Amino acid sequence: MLSIKNLQAKVEEKDILKGLSLEIKPGEVHAIMGPNGAGKSTLGNVLSGREGYEVTGGEVSFDGKNILEMDTEERAREGLFLAFQYPVEIPGVSNLEFLKASVDAVRAHRGEEPMDSVTFLKLAREKCKAVNLDQNFLKRGVNEGFSGGEKKRNEIMQMMLLQPKLCILDETDSGLDIDALQVVAEGVNSQRDPNRSFIVVTHYQRLLDYIVPDFVHVLADGKIVKSGGKELALELEEKGYGWIEKAISEEKGA
């Protein structure tokens, strides 16, 4: 589904990703962990095509297509979804309008007719309930005046409606209490599917108690330096990232 080979990228002339490679098959959940500044959020932003990130080398293939040549909207229509660490507000545009337009754009890309408004409203209300959001949130501006937890739940609701092929969750657990974390995780787990894959970016292991990954990767100094199963996340929780950073430092000094 997703093939990343030797990906290199920079932000404001600073090299962040320095030869990252990763293969993700349909139905797999991959957790990306690492210290602050390792490039975790940069990876998600580069994959989604966010402005301000310059790819300087490498290849990224999504379902056999080179997504680096696509703009952000085209990548979304192809089935790539990014849940931001800090979801943005869009004042003046209701959640319902935004979601309907997004879903219809994806449907049009697939050659399908727009969903009629009555059917969509019923579906949106169902998804609101699934992530424990009041239906009044559909009338409000996108993320406008939402708490941190409400923004995260709103993004999971978007994911449920859009039905993407690849979901990138960028520190979705950031700032969430345990109850909100469980609601978000349940929403994510309900979308696990043999044809849908996830990249779960997190700094802490606790999210992975609820969204259990197939693979865990440690990102440090712009590339994946260690991979394993769920036990690797537990090791990181116990030891921290110091041992990883020390190994990298010794390797550079060798």
Q: Where are each of the predicted segments found?
A:
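ABC ATPase NBD Q-loop/coupling interface
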Residues: 59-75, 143
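The feature captures the beta-strand-to-loop junction immediately N-terminal to the Walker
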Residues: 33-35
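Conserved beta-strand-loop-alpha-helix hinge in the C-terminal portion
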Residues: 215, 219, 223-246
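Walker B catalytic motif
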Residues: 168-172, 179
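Short coil-to-beta microelement around the adenine-binding A-loop and adjacent beta1/P-loop entry
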Residues: 14-15, 74, 182
